A protein has these predicted regions:
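Alpha-helix boundary/capping residues
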Residues: 9, 87-91, 96-99, 170, ...
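Substrate-access "cap/lid" subdomains that shape
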Residues: 3-7, 12, 17-157, 181-205, ...
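Short glycine/proline-rich turn/loop motifs
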Residues: 170-182, 249-260
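Domain-core and long-helix interface of multi-subunit machines
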Residues: 166-168, 186
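Short, low-complexity, polar/charged sequence segments that are solvent-exposed and flexible
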Residues: 24-25, 37-40, 154-159, 230-236, ...
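Short Gly/aromatic-enriched secondary-structure transition segments
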Residues: 149-166, 291-297
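Coil-to-alpha-helix initiation sites in intrinsically disordered, low-complexity, charged segments
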Residues: 79, 161-162, 377
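Mobile gating loops/cap/lid regions near enzyme active sites that modulate substrate access
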Residues: 201-391
Length: 391
């Protein structure tokens, strides 16, 4: 995680530039990581205690969780340390998988005060005393579509026919296109808020130079009557194909992703690689380009100024600068009025969007969202759907 390295005191001064693509800046909870799970098994972080219990069960030392806790209570710290250090990586990973709680999401770094500062990644980025390096940071417009496309509650999968019948399972149709687009839009915007806009604001606050982008290319083909621009769009990791273009020549990528847009995709790829290479060499994506390209603006905190670059092909909007900026209050206000949802839908959307996102949403935001009408609702069905997702 480049963001974690950028924020780590141990890495301070070890590099001259940093590129953060679709980063994660939220951190795990130390208290949850060091404690037993509550009785309902809901926790946002995998517990080291629970992993240790699972190891004792897997090794046959304890029959169940109760026995594992009883056995552990009789061990000294040095005995526990010796037991853990004797475990193989495979044993540790197997125990971690079995010990996952309800609600836990993507693995996040721990603000242990040594490797990562106790005030977390964002806190470190705001510190003007840190060594200053130029940063290139961004996300893709439709980040969450890659994950939503694999959710059987949102997309119907099945056996394709015709030319594609040799494939066992493919996405066949989006069950509710308006809902799918809305959930993907908010999920991706929340990601951009945390991973681009908030990061850029924090770095700018500490007087660092930031170049931000949003990748918008979505000229995917239609397969089995399903438009992959709607299904995947500018999804997570899509920009990597344009930075490592040899992947575009692979048969599946050329058929399922690039389609007939190879020429414009190649042009965008070359422009992106020019920017990335210039930044890697000089810390300035506009310096030393082999041919004229749109100027990449430095992120600025002022209102109504060009602050990030939109990366798209010349068959669409092309490469353009944008003055847009996301804020939590702005996203919540937009969701609160979005006609694609009724009130219950808005409440469920906010619940789902924030269920596994690490730092979560400030409880005060829940108090004020929709005048507090989302506070006392039953989210059990949504929770069950979220916990069945396997990405």
């Amino acid at each position: 995680n480049v963001a974690a390295l950028l924020a780590s005191p141990l890495a301070d001064g070890l590099f001259q530039k940093a590129i953060i693509q679709s980063g994660i800046v939220s951190v795990a909870s130390l208290s949850e990581a060091e404690s037993d799970y509550p009785s309902d098994g809901v926790s946002g972080t995998i517990s080291s205690q629970e992993i240790l219990y699972q190891l004792l069960i897997n090794d046959g030392i304890a029959e169940d969780l109760v026995a594992a806790k009883r056995h552990l209570a009789n061990l000294t710290s040095s005995e526990i340390a010796g037991y853990l250090r004797a475990q193989t990586p495979a044993n540790l990973l197997q125990a971690e998988q079995a010990a996952k709680p309800r609600k836990v999401g993507m693995t996040r770094v721990f603000p242990d005060g040594v490797v990562v500062r106790s005030d977390g990644i964002v806190g470190a980025l705001k510190d003007p005393a840190r060594t200053k390096v130029p940063v290139l940071v961004g996300t893709n417009r439709d980040e969450t579509k890659l994950f939503n496309a694999m959710d059987p509650h949102l997309v119907e999968w099945g056996q394709p026919d015709g030319l594609w019948s040799f494939i066992d399972r493919m996405p066949l149709t989006i069950k509710n296109p308006n809902y799918y687009e809305a959930m993907s839009e908010y999920g991706s915007d929340f990601w951009k808020l945390r991973a681009t806009d908030d990061v850029a604001r924090s770095l700018t606050q500490s007087e660092q130079t930031v170049f931000a982008y949003r990748f918008d290319w979505d000229e995917l083909p239609t397969i089995q009557d399903l438009d992959y621009a709607d299904l995947l769009g500018a999804g997570h990791a899509m920009e990597l194909l344009f930075l490592f273009p040899a992947a575009m020549e692979q048969t599946l990528v050329s058929k399922f992703v690039i389609g007939d847009g190879a020429e414009s995709a190649d042009r965008l790829s070359q422009q992106m690689r020019n920017y990335w290479a210039a930044f890697a060499y000089t810390g300035k994506p506009n310096l030393g380009l082999p041919a004229p390209q749109p100027t990449w603006p430095v992120w600025q905190a002022a209102d109504n100024v060009e602050r990030f670059l939109v990366l798209d092909s010349d068959q669409d909007q092309g490469i353009v600068s944008s003055t847009a900026a996301l804020t939590l209050n702005g996203l919540l206000a937009k969701l609160e009025q979005d006609p694609r949802f009724d009130l219950m839908g808005r409440c469920q959307a906010l619940y789902g969007l924030t269920y596994r996102n690490g730092d979560g949403i400030d409880p005060a935001a829940w108090q004020t969202f929709a005048a507090g009408q989302c506070l006392d609702r039953d989210y059990q069905t949504v929770t069950q759907l979220l916990e069945r997702q396997q990405f």
